[in-house]
Amino acid sequence: MRKSPLFVDFSLLKFNRYFRAIFMARMMSVFALGILIVAVPVQIHQLTGSTLQVGMAMALDGVGMFVGLMCGGVLADRYNRRTLILLARGLCGLGFLALALNSFIAEPSVLALYIMSLWDGFFGAMGMTALMAAIPSIVGRENLAAAGALSMLTVRFGAVLAPAVGGIIIASAGVSWNYLLAGIATLGTLIPLARLPSLEPQDYEPAHPLRALLEGFQFLVQNKIVGAVVAVGTLQALLSAIRVLFPALAEDGYNGGAFEVGLMFSAVPLGAMIGAFTSGWVGGLRRPGTVMTGSVVVSSLIVASLGLISHLVVGLAALALLGYLGSIASLLQFTLVQGHTPDRLLGRVNSLWNAQDVVGDALGALGIGALARVTAPLLAVFSFGASATLAGIIMSVGFVSLRQLSGVDALAPLDAPVELVEHESPGF
């Protein structure tokens, strides 16, 4: 059967049993996190009636995630990545079951919710970093685009469906069942993940953790391709913060309310899902760097145009296109970062790359929120998009190595082939 030049290539699931195991675990994990992400803020609000305390829990999750990324990156380049993945997933699952136990008692502890938010953020990020570092050796660098698209498709589907399912569970059975199901599903991911082979990092050199992390940062600065990709990715992360002004855009631009805001929030992931599903052509690009930077520049122009659009349908179409381009840019970032980073640095580079995405989104939200306080929301959106467009053009011109990168160079092997050794375990 010939591969479609348009749609994502599913053959990796058929022929690579290790990636198939990861895909199954990822689907279960996305579902678990989707129903959990609804439960925590709902329960805290029920217990305290305070949006501030809900925000504190979300902030603690973010802090845990950032620290987990930093620690996980160093650990993933030092220890067996399979062990780290299983350990992190198992501890996350136990944390969710602890939340279920806390919710079943007569007076649930808000402090326990705070602690578990930190716990989940830390171990979730640690496991994610180890898993991303293992992907190139499992699928081969030539299959990174397909692996990234399939993973992205899973996340997009989960982001749309799982929170809705979580809300239904809360309404029909109570928040305790969200935690219980999330814990069971997360521990259930250990079944497919236990099938993974031993995933020892290559060429490990003992070093102090801070020095090891610094080495990863130095690689980002010195490598013209990976450093440029991360810089462009930061700009894209800033653009994602436009959602902060969706309520103001709906009111001032479209004379709408909550219904219109909901449509706007749905348009972006819908476009992203279409982008992931129709990304079969990405792996064969002759100039992947140019397409990536071009996608971000056009995305910036779309954000600027939102400050000028006065029709809801046109605005929703623009947001869907924004999601589509963001999906393509993210997939190319994944492929280029994974494809140009040596195995011995994959943990640390992935941790720093994901951290900049988290920080970039937060800074973008803060910046556009502050801009909207001193100007009209529509003007703030236009100014934000125009500034991002200028920055994107400067990057496109300035990052010569990225612009001239060919598809053949993007798939160039950096390490010796990795021999995947079956893990002898009587379990599962």
Residue ranges and their predicted role:
Residues 110-121, 125, 146-199, 264-266, ...:
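Hydrophobic alpha-helical transmembrane segments
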Residues 27, 95, 108-126, 234, ...:
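Hydrophobic core of transmembrane alpha-helices in multi-pass small-molecule transporters
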Residues 57, 66-71, 78, 82-88, ...:
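C-terminal transmembrane bundle of multi-pass solute transporters/carriers
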Residues 1-19, 198-231, 414-428:
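Juxtamembrane intracellular "pre-TM" segments in multi-pass secondary transporters
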Residues 27, 59, 63, 90, ...:
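Transmembrane alpha-helical cores of Major Facilitator Superfamily
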Residues 23, 27, 31, 35-39, ...:
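A single, central transmembrane helix in multi-pass transporters
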Residues 105-106, 133, 137, 179, ...:
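Helix-loop junctions on the cytosolic side of multi-pass membrane transporters
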Residues 36-39, 43, 48-58, 149, ...:
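Small-residue hotspots at the loop-to-helix junctions and early N-terminal turns
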